[in-house]
Every structure is written in structure tokens, then in C-alpha cells.
From Swiss-Prot:
Main location: cytoplasm
Family: Belongs to the RimM family.
Protein name as annotated: Ribosome maturation factor RimM
Domain (PRC barrel) ranges: 96-175
Species of provenance: Histophilus somni (strain 129Pt) (Haemophilus somnus)
Length: 175
């Protein structure tokens, strides 16, 4: 059987009411898009466990969910702050030049002059554009520990090769 690759898409929050409902914090671009990705898995004691969504709704601008088999507040409390994941295979294919953040994290970033600037450790959303957070190697010639490089495809980011986990950028190594 093929190993499942799980990506975190949200987190359960505190309980709501006495019948097992929980607040939900979605990491998807549109909060309610989290419900498009099924089935869900919960990370309990370091292991991904499948869970079935019974119902969801908005309440006072918050998302709340009811999970199948969770009918009491006390049981729901044990799931507070638990991460929600989905199998990567349920994500839609993207257009050319679009990438999922989880695919970019871990990529080596090299500028046009061939200088290895570091490895993408995380991504940031700024409103205007996404930003690569690049952790520099300890032997960085410019003394940098971290670089913030805007993910502007074609302008700054010239090439992304996911097979070799390499991102080529038009960016001065001194920044």
C-alpha cells in the first residue's frame, strides 16, 4: 500500500456547547475550503487517525464542526488543539507557475550567478505576494542567517524544479 503523505490544513480549537462541537481554525486560503478536502485525519499522539466530519456551520463568524462519534463536551475537549490533515492526493493539480507551499519548503535556492543562498524553511503571506523564507547555510559569505525573497514568478523566481528541489532566483546574495 502506498504511504500517505498528509498535509496540515487546519486545527481544532476549544469546545463549543455540550454536544461535542469544536471550533475550527482553517489554514486554507478561503476558510470554508477546508471542507472540500476529505477525508480528514487528526494527529493524535504523533499518529494520523482518520475522522469523519458529521456537520459544520458558521457561528458568530467562527467555523464550528461536529465530528462523527464525538457527542460529549468532555470527549471533544481531548481534541482541542489537534491538527487536521488531508492526504496530498486530494489537492487539485495546479496551473503552470503555481505551487503548493509544502512543495517549496525544503528546496535549495540558487541565484542566477550560481550562489547557493540557502534552503526554504517556510513561506509567508504578505498580502501583496508570498515570500520565501530562506535559511542560509552557516558558511554564508555575506553573513546572512535568513533571507526574505518575494515569490514573484518570472520577475524574481525564474525557475522551480521540484524534481531536483531547486529554485532559481534573480536576487542579489547580499540582500
Amino acid at each position: 500500500m502506498e504511504q500517505q503523505r498528509i498535509e496540515v490544513v487546519g486545527k481544532l480549537g476549544s469546545t463549543y456547547g455540550i454536544r461535542g462541537w469544536l471550533r475550527l481554525y482553517s489554514s486554507t486560503e478561503q476558510a470554508e475550503s477546508i471542507f472540500d478536502y476529505q477525508p480528514w485525519f487528526l494527529k493524535i499522539k504523533g499518529q494520523w487517525q482518520p475522522i469523519e466530519l458529521e456537520s459544520w456551520k458558521f457561528h458568530n463568524h467562527e467555523l464550528i464542526v461536529k465530528l462523527k462519534g464525538i457527542n460529549e463536551r468532555e470527549v471533544a475537549q481531548t481534541l482541542a488543539n489537534v491538527e487536521i490533515g488531508v492526504n496530498l492526493s486530494v489537492f487539485p493539480l495546479l496551473d503552470e507557475g503555481d505551487f503548493y507551499w509544502h512543495d517549496l519548503i525544503g528546496c535549495q535556492v540558487v541565484n542566477l550567478q550560481g550562489y547557493a543562498m540557502g534552503v526554504v524553511s517556510e513561506m509567508m503571506e504578505t498580502g501583496a505576494n508570498d515570500v520565501l523564507v530562506v535559511r542560509a547555510s552557516t558558511k554564508d559569505a555575506f553573513g546572512k542567517k535568513e533571507r526574505l525573497i518575494p515569490f514573484l514568478y518570472e520577475q524574481v523566481v525564474k525557475r522551480v524544479d521540484l524534481s531536483s528541489k531547486t529554485i532559481e532566483v534573480d536576487w542579489d546574495a547580499g540582500f
